[in-house]
Amino acid sequence: YKGAPGRECEQANRLDPEGIRAVHRAYLAAGADAIKTNTFGLPRMAAAQDPEWEALADAGWKLAAEAAAGTDAAVFADLGPAPDTEGLSAAQVYTAVVRRFAALGAKNYLFETLSSDTGVLDAVRALRETVPDAFVQVSFAVLPDGYTREGQHCRALVRRMADSGLVDAVGLNCVSAPGAMRTLVQQLGQVGIPLSVMPNAGYPVVTRTQVQYR
């Protein structure tokens, strides 16, 4: 999806809804049995107290749900990293966002590309008060050496999620290419809950004015 209008990708939910629907439908046509809302940046927007974030959450959920209607595909409310700010903690931000999605009817939640687990379990506890049967997946962005950009090792992060009793699936995504991620997963071993793996297609290489993954 190129040429997204607005300063944030999520703004396309309102400025180009048909374009976002087309992306969802393309995944479904390719055989996807789950899609995620175009809302990765909402926690960051909520932390900055951007007045648009709630409307973008609503629009993002509606577009994904409409695209999946009439299929067996699951729809995941997608949440990227939430920063701690002077005004709001990561836990407060995540909690506000998941409660918004819960009010819209979301049953599946994906916290992804995280460098730490700060605030995640607090938000999941709050979510389960409203949606006790929610499916929650948490995924960390880990470098090939096993550490996130905040210096936390994936083994400790995955173990905390698996041992919490609050998370249904845990895993790794982004940053590392398939070979490196395979090695990390082998090092993790059995974790007791389903393990998700979503590697990068490769590593970005800038050639003149283009970015290619190799």
Predicted regions and their residues:
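Domain-level signal for soluble alpha/beta catalytic cores
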Residues: 1-214
